[in-house]
Amino acid sequence: MIKNDTIAAIATPPGEGSIAIVRISGPEAIQITDKIFSGSVPSFSSHTAHLGTVSYNGQQIDQTLLLIMRAPRSFTGEDVVELQCHGGYFSCSQILAALIAEGARPALPGEFSQRAFLNGKIDLIQAEAIQNIIAADNLDAFHIAQNHFQGHFSKKVQQISSLIIESLAFIEVLADFPEEEQPDMQEPMNRLHEAILIIDDLIASFDQGQRLAQGTSIVLAGHPNAGKSSLLNALTNKNRAIVTDIPGTTRDILEENWMLQGKRIRLIDSAGQRETHNPIEQEGIERAIAAMEASEAILWVMDASQPPPPLPEILMRKPSLLLWNKSDLATPPHLETTLPQLAVSAKTGAGMIELKQFIQQWMQKQQLGKNGKVFLISSRHHTILQHMRTYLLSAQEGLQSQSPPEFIALELRQALQTTGNLSGSEINETILGEIFSRFCIGK
């Protein structure tokens, strides 16, 4: 990548909209923009806005609002100019073409963020968080990405790095002065133990972070013809599942994404639980059981007009709600259990507001104590931390067995390098290019 030229790109999504933004960054950003803008751009103070027109070859393209951010007080750390024009395809495209004709280069995907990283404005963790913020399709994913972008994950990595450096300095003194009396090894042991605890906490957050980012899984389960598929359709406002009076219609797992107050829920319809000699239906029942085991919560659906069937043991092990569906046909019977119960009707909508409120309250309880916590969602981060942990455990064992300090120092240096792989201070350009190539153009 050429790092000293000036790049330009449209920073807003294509299509109709009230405004579009063209972004320019680099050493010639101000001079190039001055060639097409009606005002004297070099005279503008940093972080000011100016209304004017953009023209090229004697023809006015559009009225624009120009924002100028001089280096180093900009996102990229370079001189940056943004031109806000009317939305749509033609205005921003012609402005971009004029900038390129005057000497700017079309930006590569993620190149603005890559320049911000290379100029020390953000680290690699924060750069990756930008992409995750853009891609977030629910509030949990958005909050996790924002947490990373605000530097909370980076602070954890810096803390680990400091503990490793302190331990390494201690060990290197031993290697340099072997004739001296062996000092107490408890100090580096304590530092390594603290670093490993931080790493373990981060690694342990990965599964939960993935679940939060991908959505909470809730299974609709119960006996045949209780109305599970009807409830799926009613909750999602879609005719997603086939609904008939024939028992055993649902034979496979059916998953639908459902947004509730910004939270993503993976709502799963499953085959009715009963004894059957049909091998296809039996396969569906086994898949339903597996889905319940893998889920985070179960909505156990029962027919209010029928005698209550026995409850499966799994309902006592998982967060579960008993739903008496078809409450428009009959008053639900009394069931002696500690599990919460709710009468609903997928047909009339009765109880559906209460059901949504129950799910929302349950999800809020799951979030208690998680605000501000760092969650991993990247497999890259998870893998690097596992390698880091291996190196530190090896160094810790070396200290305990009084291995040669050179061996321990080698393990610590490798662990330190992995912290650089996370932050980007120790990573090759090929991997960097691969990471930033996933970004959109203009970011």
UniProtKB/Swiss-Prot annotation:
Residues 215-364 form the TrmE-type G domain. It comes from the Bacteria. Binds 1 potassium ion per subunit. The keyword GTP-binding applies. Its cofactor is K(+). It is an enzyme of class 3 (hydrolase). GTP binds at residues 225-230, 244-250, 269-272. Mg(2+) binds at S229, T250. Pfam families: MMR_HSR1 (PF01926), MnmE_helical (PF12631), TrmE_N (PF10396). GO terms for molecular function: GTP binding; GTPase activity; metal ion binding. Transmembrane segments: none annotated. InterPro entries: G_TrmE (IPR031168), GTP-bd (IPR006073), GTP-bd_TrmE_N (IPR018948), GTPase_MnmE (IPR004520), MnmE_dom2 (IPR027368), MnmE_helical (IPR025867), P-loop_NTPase (IPR027417), Small_GTP-bd (IPR005225). It is found in: Cytoplasm. (6S)-5-formyl-5,6,7,8-tetrahydrofolate binds at R23, E82, K121, K443. Its EC number is 3.6.-.-. GO terms for biological process: tRNA methylation; tRNA wobble uridine modification. K(+) binds at N225, T244, I246, T249. Homodimer. Heterotetramer of two MnmE and two MnmG subunits. NCBIfam families: mnmE_trmE_thdF, small_GTP. Belongs to the TRAFAC class TrmE-Era-EngA-EngB-Septin-like GTPase superfamily. TrmE GTPase family. PANTHER family: TRNA MODIFICATION GTPASE GTPBP3 (PTHR42714), TRNA MODIFICATION GTPASE GTPBP3, MITOCHONDRIAL (PTHR42714:SF2). Exhibits a very high intrinsic GTPase hydrolysis rate. Involved in the addition of a carboxymethylaminomethyl (cmnm) group at the wobble position (U34) of certain tRNAs, forming tRNA-cmnm(5)s(2)U34. This is tRNA modification GTPase MnmE. The gene is mnmE.
